[in-house]
């Protein structure tokens, strides 16, 4: 079966938790599209282009992974990409309710699109982009939570943002 999956997110920035789920999805599906959302309701530190570039760098070793920026409804993006599966990560029980609602909405909008939930490796279960940015903003070392290129880009971004 030729299964194309989409792993959508803001990835601001991509963390080791994201990378772990991407690697595992790449083993499960023939082709994985990392859909990086423009998402106007969030105010990302990195531009869409920067996020696409960082995710490309982190996933360059995965031959069946493609990185694409998008805006608009996820179900429309999935149709454009001819994907039949959405991959979502669940870090904790607290993520489940939101993801459950989202999966049901996506199913209502696109009945043929299945949601598959993956849980992170234990060492990544607490990592979020928000926490990584917060640690970096206060001068903490984020190298254990993100790829080295992401840590460098984040440090440069925060240095530019300081008054």
Swiss-Prot record:
Keyword Ligase appears in the UniProt entry: no
One Pfam family here: CTP_transf_like
Listed cofactors: Mg(2+)
UniProt keyword annotation of ATP-binding present: yes
Keyword set, alphabetical order: ATP-binding, Coenzyme A biosynthesis, Cytoplasm, Magnesium, Nucleotide-binding, Nucleotidyltransferase, Transferase
Annotated pathway: Cofactor biosynthesis; coenzyme A biosynthesis; CoA from (R)-pantothenate: step 4/5
Superkingdom: Bacteria
Protein location: Cytoplasm
Reactions performed catalytically: (R)-4'-phosphopantetheine + ATP + H(+) = 3'-dephospho-CoA + diphosphate
GO biological process: one example: coenzyme A biosynthetic process
GO MF annotation list: ATP binding; pantetheine-phosphate adenylyltransferase activity
EC annotation from Swiss-Prot or TrEMBL: 2.7.7.3
Subunit: Homohexamer.
Family per record: Belongs to the bacterial CoaD family.
Biological function: Reversibly transfers an adenylyl group from ATP to 4'-phosphopantetheine, yielding dephospho-CoA (dPCoA) and pyrophosphate.
Protein name: Phosphopantetheine adenylyltransferase
Organism: Shewanella baltica (strain OS155 / ATCC BAA-1091)
């Amino acid at each position: 079966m030729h299964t194309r999956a989409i792993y959508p997110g803001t990835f601001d920035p991509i963390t080791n938790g994201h990378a772990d789920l991407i690697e595992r999805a790449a083993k499960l599906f023939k082709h994985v599209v990392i859909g990086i959302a423009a998402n106007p309701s969030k105010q990302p530190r990195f531009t869409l282009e920067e996020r696409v570039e960082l995710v490309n760098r982190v996933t360059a070793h995965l031959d069946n992974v493609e990185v694409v920026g998008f805006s608009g409804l996820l179900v429309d993006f999935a149709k454009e990409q001819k994907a039949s599966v959405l991959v979502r990560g669940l870090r904790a029980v607290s993520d489940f309710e939101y993801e459950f609602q989202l999966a049901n909405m996506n199913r209502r909008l696109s009945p043929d699109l299945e949601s598959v939930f993956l849980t992170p490796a234990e060492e990544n279960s607490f990592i979020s982009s928000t926490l990584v940015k917060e640690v970096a903003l206060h001068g903490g070392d984020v190298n254990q939570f993100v790829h080295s290129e992401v840590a460098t880009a984040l440090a440069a971004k925060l240095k530019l943002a300081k008054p």
